[in-house]
């Protein structure tokens, strides 16, 4: 297992994420609210989040929120899927929101250009103000931080939360907004108290040649992020992600004794 000096990299879990999330909550979420205000003025009733990899998973989680607590039409679509199979309805009552950390994802930029050409409101969420994606969108937010899962989730969540608040208030939405304010403290606690346990689990998992990740509901996108983005991209571990309700319908038949099956199926 790699022994990495966390002070030399910016993509690992560190206490810096606490300050980054605090900054996003205080500075960037209000910017999202400004964009939503414009969406409401334009009678936007359909939102397309377009992204790839981890940002797409964050957008999918926000879509789940919209589906559960509202009748908003919210979609989370991979970049090339949006470009190659462009939704039939793409007009001036739609919003296309592109999410790309480094801001150069070709298909996400193209999706924004398609949306803008059809009259849709377009917005980009990215790390830097000079990223190419910002020139393709009418609105942009450059969050200037590294803990992208938390940031993308907060920004996409904030779009949906604010839209529901303004158009069709739901009792649970206020509770969720209040809970999000506790996120920095919760993250700090997890970083301080779980790192050693995580290291021990990582050492154990490093011996496994393949890992199945099983999840459902709002945790299914997170399951994909961990099972594919983290395990395959970052650690080169073979594996797949399976919806928990489908696990017993076939996949369970090939699970061998001793094979690891991480489960993230609870809310």
Locate predicted features.
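Short amphipathic alpha-helical surface micro-motifs
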Residues: 30-31, 57, 78-79, 121-125, ...
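Generic preference for hydrophobic/aromatic residues in regular secondary structure cores
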Residues: 25, 74, 187, 262-263
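A short, well-structured beta->alpha microelement
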Residues: 73-85, 240-253
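Active-site phosphate/pyrophosphate-binding segments
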Residues: 6-45, 141, 147-148, 162-244, ...
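Glycine-rich phosphate-binding loops that contact phosphosugars or nucleotide phosphates
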Residues: 42-179, 183, 258, 265-267
């Amino acid at each position: 297992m790699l022994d990495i000096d966390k002070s030399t990299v910016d993509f690992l879990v560190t206490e810096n994420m606490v300050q980054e999330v605090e900054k996003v909550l205080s500075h960037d979420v209000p910017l999202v609210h400004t964009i939503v205000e414009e969406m409401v003025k334009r009678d936007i009733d359909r939102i397309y989040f377009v992204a790839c990899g981890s940002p797409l998973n964050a957008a999918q989680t926000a879509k789940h929120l919209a589906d559960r607590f509202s009748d908003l039409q919210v979609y989370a679509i991979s970049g090339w899927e949006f470009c190659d199979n462009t939704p039939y309805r793409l007009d001036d009552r739609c919003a296309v929101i592109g999410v790309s950390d480094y801001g150069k994802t070709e298909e996400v930029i193209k999706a924004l250009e398609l949306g803008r050409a059809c009259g849709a409101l377009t917005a980009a969420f990215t790390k830097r103000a000079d990223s190419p994606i910002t020139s393709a969108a009418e609105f942009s937010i450059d969050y200037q931080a590294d803990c992208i899962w938390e940031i993308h989730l907060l920004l996409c969540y904030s779009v949906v939360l604010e839209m529901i608040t303004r158009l069709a208030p739901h009792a649970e939405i206020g509770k969720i907004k209040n809970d999000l304010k506790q996120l920095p403290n919760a993250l700090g606690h997890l970083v301080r108290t779980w790192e050693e346990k995580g290291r021990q689990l990582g050492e154990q998992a490093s011996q496994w040649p393949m890992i199945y990740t099983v999840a459902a509901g709002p945790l299914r996108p997170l399951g994909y992020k961990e099972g594919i983005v983290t395990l395959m991209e970052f650690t080169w571990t073979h594996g797949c992600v399976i919806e928990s309700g489908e696990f017993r319908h076939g996949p369970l038949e090939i699970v061998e004794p001793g094979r690891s099956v991480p489960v993230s199926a609870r809310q």
